[in-house]
Amino acid sequence: MCQAGEDYAEPVQRDPPPVPRPSREQKCVKCAEGLPVVVIRAGDAFCRDCFKAFYVHKFRAMLGKNRLIFPGEKVLLAWSGGPSSSSMLWQVLEGLSQDSAKRLRFVPGVIYVDEGAACGQSLEDRVKTLAEVKLILQKTGFPWHVVALEEVFGLPPSVLCCASQEPAGTEEAYKVAVDSFLQQQHVLGVEGCVSPAEGEEQIHLSHSQESLGTTGSPVAAQTEALSRLFNSIKTLTAKEELLQTLRTHLIVHVARTHGYCKVMTGESCTRLAIKLMTNLALGRGAFLAWDTGFSDERHGDVVLVRPMRDHTLKEVAFYNHLFGVPSVFTPAIDTKAPEKASIHRLMEAFILRLQTLFPSTVSTVYRCVLLSLLPMLEGSRAHGWGRLATFACLPPSVDPLPPYVLAEAQLRSQRAWVSQEIQEYLITDSDEEEEEGRVEPGHAQSCKAVKQEGEDTGIGL
């Protein structure tokens, strides 16, 4: 109520509430003692030691849970120089060290594929990049192989053949292999795992490093052929698909040549989520389980594994920064390309932008879709469907393609022609039913008995 002569004072000016800041008393969520240096997710602040233990455990758990790599096996590490593959190489290097609690028991090797010719790099830039690559690979102490993408023009047609694959070992077989390996090491007087000794395998240097840029050499001709192949393709989407296919064929060939039965790739969870959405857009949904799962067994005797599939790009970047993991920057085929230049770039921008707003986007997309693809994976293994997809994008003309691709295409064309020619002479189930309908019932039963007897004795009728 208003009162006469009352003095109304102006409202007291108050300072705005302070902006909340991270408390200096905040501790690591793991040990509750150390000061946090990394925040992976909201509320998940780790100190340096706990973050390293968390990161290493993810890598070890992925290998131990699947148990596809047996002790003493030769494993080829596909290293591109990027953050994820460099982190994978560093994990293997530390896992084989003497001070590791549970040392890895396989024998590693490293392969680097020089894609400079396909990405439009100059000769000087390629030589400089190879020098940095050689310096890092020599520090690892592993046998290493440097090959150029141009070498796909010298691959044999057998690289596309799916070699016979031994049945996957059970858990009991894995335990027996571990016990046998440890017993063998005890007999030899070596405690721990086998690490590649110096001189065990000679370093394989491809022509890309020995005679790179020699005019008139076969490498110069192959480089020109590779450039002509990629220049004949008009869309960036087709170029990226072709590059991925040729790279995989080259790595599988090197693995077979040098006796590697497993190939490790450094694809992270973020990268696989982007690849998953990209393959759906490209109409390759039937092969998602092979393209994004832990293992890819479509090549038969060489199995591709992805031990970094539980690590996000954010975790990889933090780990490499905190622990000084070396890497080599090499421009990709889509470097500086606009967002809508290809389906790959569009899906990458979409997933990363969504991940910024909703931090659980990558894990949700990846894990939910993979759960629905598990039955599809089992069905493709039973019927061999995963081996049908060889090439996703072809150039307007087949002339620039590598010889082994042309040979395989010609062979498949001949198979289709032969199958069409003999189609009318093949006996189908419907023909047998019609034949049985025209003969006497007793004669039909005797024919079935003779046919069953022939199948039981291994004689085909």
Segments (PLM) and residue ranges:
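ATP-dependent adenylation/nucleotidyltransferase module used to activate substrates
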Residues: M1-W290, F294, L322, V418-L461
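Cys/His-clustered metal-coordination modules, chiefly Zn-binding fingers
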Residues: P359-D431, A444
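Flexible helical/loop "lid" subdomain adjacent to adenine-nucleotide binding pockets
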Residues: C261, T270, I274, L280-A317, ...
